[in-house]
């Protein structure tokens, strides 16, 4: 008989200082003793539910964490946002993956302990909220292809894309891309092309040699367009995410939260 996802995580839970309290059907409750570096132990009663081979987890009652907090990656139903499910969701079909799932839960809860002290999410490389994460991923991939400096700048929030109208060319809409406050290139948004494809590429791969023209440097002209487009969509979807939550009450456990501006 093939073990279910819940049975697999239950079979290895003791390795992660957890024990089964109840397990029936597609629901189980675990008591996890989270030990921190300072010796403090935080008991978590975790409710885990399965949907096929995928698992979701929440605190049984909001004792250690708020019941909802986008800034702390706690969904509206109280489940933990452990990863971006569309790309990174774990399919628990073996004990190896079950252990990886527990490691992910442990890392998440340790980060939550840090949030309690810092009053902000400690990891700068976190996923954006909701559908914005899809475009964040696309932007990161494009930045990576353009060179490590671009990827680092993007992760440090030093890539800014501004839309404006061209002074000439019938006021066409363009996206201007700034990296560390320096305007590097612009993109025609109606044709998805870099405005000046003859400019020197900014990827840095030429070393001491004169950089190649952007249009002739690998696929970097296309990557530059993808970065600009994805960054704009990322910001658009992030704004839509927060707009949809207008009226929800802020839990007050982080210093910066868009919900604080609400009623």
Regions found by a protein language model. Give the residues of each.
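Compact alpha/beta protein-protein interaction domains typified by the UBC
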Residues: 10, 14-87, 95-96, 162-202
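Short secondary-structure junctions and interdomain/linker hinges
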Residues: 16-20, 108, 112-116, 161
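Domain-level detector for trafficking modules
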Residues: 74-144
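Charge-rich (especially acidic), low-complexity segments
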Residues: 123-263
């Amino acid at each position: 008989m093939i073990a279910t996802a819940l049975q697999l995580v239950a079979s290895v839970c003791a390795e992660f200082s957890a024990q089964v309290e109840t397990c029936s059907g597609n629901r189980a409750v675990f008591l996890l003793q989270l030990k921190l570096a300072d010796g403090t132990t935080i008991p978590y009663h975790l409710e885990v539910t399965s949907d096929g081979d995928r698992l979701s987890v929440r605190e049984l009652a909001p004792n250690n964490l708020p019941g909802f907090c986008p800034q702390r990656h706690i969904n509206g139903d109280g489940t933990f946002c452990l990863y971006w499910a569309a790309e990174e969701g774990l399919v628990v079909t073996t004990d190896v993956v079950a252990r990886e799932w527990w490691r992910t839960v442990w890392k998440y809860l340790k980060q939550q302990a840090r949030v309690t002290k810092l009053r902000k999410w400690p990891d700068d490389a976190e996923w954006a909220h909701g559908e914005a994460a899809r475009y964040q991923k696309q932007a990161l991939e494009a930045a990576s292809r353009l060179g490590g400096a671009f990827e680092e700048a993007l992760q440090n929030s030093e890539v800014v894309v501004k839309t404006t109208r061209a002074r000439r060319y019938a006021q066409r809409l363009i996206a201007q891309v700034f990296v560390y406050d320096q305007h590097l290139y612009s993109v025609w948004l109606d044709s998805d092309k870099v405005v000046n494809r003859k400019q020197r590429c900014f990827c840095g791969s030429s070393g001491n040699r004169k950089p190649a023209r952007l249009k002739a440097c690998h696929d970097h002209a296309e990557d530059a367009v993808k970065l600009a487009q994805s960054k704009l969509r990322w910001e658009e979807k992030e704004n839509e995410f927060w707009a949809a939550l207008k009226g929800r009450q802020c839990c007050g456990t982080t210093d910066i939260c868009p919900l604080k501006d609400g009623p």
